[in-house]
């Protein structure tokens, strides 16, 4: 379960908080967690339901036959971004959907 939750939260950060910027020399300014905002525990949804399909075809003897489940949930975070896009009623909302980008989308 932790792999699935972690993948989703990683995607949540990618699409809502992790703003990338470069300095005047073209060097990346946001190169580590100390220079950009990553999700923290309070950013994780309070209610987070995960179900594993028990009748899958994976034969690996892992917990709940859950081999390779860490990466796909990253893309599930698109649901959050799309919900924000829908909430501001603007298809031009830029990613990451930071408060600044949301405000700009609302003002268009």
Residue ranges and their predicted role:
Residues 1-108:
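C-terminal catalytic domains of large/alpha subunits in multi-subunit enzymes
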């Amino acid at each position: 379960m932790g792999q699935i939750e972690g993948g989703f939260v990683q995607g949540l950060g990618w699409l809502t908080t992790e703003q990338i910027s470069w300095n005047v020399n073209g060097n990346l300014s946001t190169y580590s967690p100390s220079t950009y905002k990553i999700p923290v525990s309070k950013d994780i949804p309070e209610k987070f339901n995960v179900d594993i399909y028990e009748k899958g075809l994976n034969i690996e003897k892992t917990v709940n036959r859950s081999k390779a489940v860490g990466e796909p949930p990253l893309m599930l975070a698109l649901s959050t971004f799309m919900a924000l896009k829908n909430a501001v009623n603007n298809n031009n909302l830029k990613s990451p959907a930071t408060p600044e980008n949301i405000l700009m989308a609302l003002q268009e």
